[in-house]
A protein has these predicted regions:
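Extreme N-terminal starter segment of soluble prokaryotic enzymes
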Residues: 1-2
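Active-site phosphate/pyrophosphate-handling residues
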Residues: 26, 42, 63, 144, ...
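A generic structural signal for well-ordered coil/turn residues at beta-strand boundaries
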Residues: 13, 23, 79, 119-120, ...
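NAD(P)H dinucleotide-binding glycine-rich loop of Rossmann-like/cofactor-binding domains
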Residues: 91-159
Length: 159
């Protein structure tokens, strides 16, 4: 598959990259659209954010929509459906996750944040709980914006 790789500060390229391996608790998705977040710009222009430094060969991108490469019967999702993806993979074991505050998980793995490669690739492996069905009239580009919309709505809720 092809992927966009950050090779160094201000240096990117599109290269052949290994397809994600199939894992029991993951679904392979075909990336449909990817947004460019401010964090992606920091990774490109500065090589990281704080202690989150990207190395050579990092694939950015956490705001994305995808096409399912297989059905998920328990979620009533069919192969080929367009979905939105939550880039956060909380542990579901810590005190915060057990209380329902997965957003506070100190062990969260975040697609597209070092050291976890992102969605600027043709395929991404994600856990089922990260997949969200979207209305058929949503374009792939609209679905990309759902992650940022969620952040904004959460900020409004807290205000």
């Amino acid at each position: 598959m092809k992927a966009l790789l950050l090779e160094d500060v201000r240096k990117i390229s599109i290269q052949e990259y290994p397809e994600p391996p199939k894992k029991d608790d993951h679904i392979i998705t075909k990336v449909n659209a990817v947004g460019i977040c401010g964090s992606d710009l920091h990774y490109f222009s500065e090589g990281g954010i704080g202690s989150a430094n990207v190395g050579s060969g990092f694939v950015p991108g956490h705001e994305f929509s995808a096409i399912l490469m297989e059905s998920i019967p328990e979620m009533n999702l069919e192969e080929g459906e367009h979905v939105a993806v939550d880039p956060a993979k909380p542990c579901f074991k810590c005190q915060w996750c057990k209380k329902g505050y997965e957003n506070l998980c100190p062990y969260v793995e975040f697609i597209g944040a070092p050291p976890f490669n992102g969605a600027m690739a043709q395929y991404v492996s994600i856990k089922k709980h990260q997949i969200h069905k979207i209305p058929k009239h949503f374009s792939p580009e609209t679905a990309v914006l759902l992650e940022t919309l969620g952040v904004a709505l959460h900020a409004v809720d807290l205000s």
